[in-house]
């Protein structure tokens, strides 16, 4: 495996969205994971809430209900890394071949290195690479190792609407 360069300059990079989420008045969380991921929900208060655009788009949309506004739960690239690693998602397949969205903090070690190797081999520079590199460093510092293997449905963030428990 290749050595990963440590990214030391995160505070000087342009700020961008990592997670596009809102919480409705009844506590339900809507999460738009990618550009055309339109999510709508009828809240207990009778109002409909929606979210669209994921974190990648310059123009995202969400509900504007002045009588009962949704709470923004968006996370940006200048948030603490502890928060980013919980909400930065990557699409992949589970052991049954179903698409799942896995948070950075749950990606196995081989997957982290594989994404960086793939991007380098394809000549792709992703603004998210620096967070994958930071996750690798974070795991070294905290002695975290996630065994390589196939993901299960439980590993992913598969629902885009999370009901308050």
Mark where each language-model region is.
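Intrinsically disordered, low-complexity segments enriched in small/polar residues
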Residues: 25, 44, 51-52, 89, ...
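Polar low-complexity intrinsically disordered regions enriched in Ser/Thr and small residues
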Residues: 30, 49, 56-57, 94, ...
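Amphipathic alpha-helical packing elements
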Residues: 86-129
């Amino acid at each position: 495996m290749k050595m990963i360069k440590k990214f030391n300059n995160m505070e000087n990079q342009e700020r961008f969205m990592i997670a596009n989420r809102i919480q409705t008045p009844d506590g339900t969380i809507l999460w738009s994971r990618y550009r055309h991921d339109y999510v709508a929900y009828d809240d207990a208060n009778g109002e409909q809430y929606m979210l669209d655009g994921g974190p990648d788009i310059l123009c995202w949309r969400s509900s504007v209900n002045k009588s009962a506004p949704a709470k923004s739960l968006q996370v940006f690239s200048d948030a603490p890394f502890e928060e980013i690693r919980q909400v930065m998602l990557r699409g992949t397949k589970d052991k049954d071949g179903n698409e799942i969205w896995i948070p950075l903090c749950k990606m196995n070690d081989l997957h982290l290195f594989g994404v960086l190797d793939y991007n380098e081999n394809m000549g792709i520079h992703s603004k998210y690479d620096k967070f994958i590199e930071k996750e690798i460093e974070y795991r070294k510092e905290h002695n975290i190792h996630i065994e390589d293997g196939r993901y299960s449905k439980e590993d992913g963030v598969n629902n885009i609407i999370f009901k308050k428990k």
